[in-house]
């Protein structure tokens, strides 16, 4: 299973459609990455999601522990990148829906 559309929307709003690592505006060229892989017990939740550009997503996934070259992104580091970027976006006047109740109260104009 993958992230729900609601979680994808929340992460895109929270990051301003900018990558949480390189901070580049990416528009549609974004992916939501599992901080802890599902294969390792990670979940499809907002807390386990980090929005990344295609390049940073490839970089995060590329590390090979059998041939360690460079320093692997850790879960803790990814969480800090995400949280710091969400705070930076929020300080510019954007307000993310941080709880499910807040998110569900948002009205969609049609």
Predicted regions and their residues:
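Accessory nucleic-acid engagement/destabilization modules that flank
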Residues: 66, 73, 78, 85-88, ...
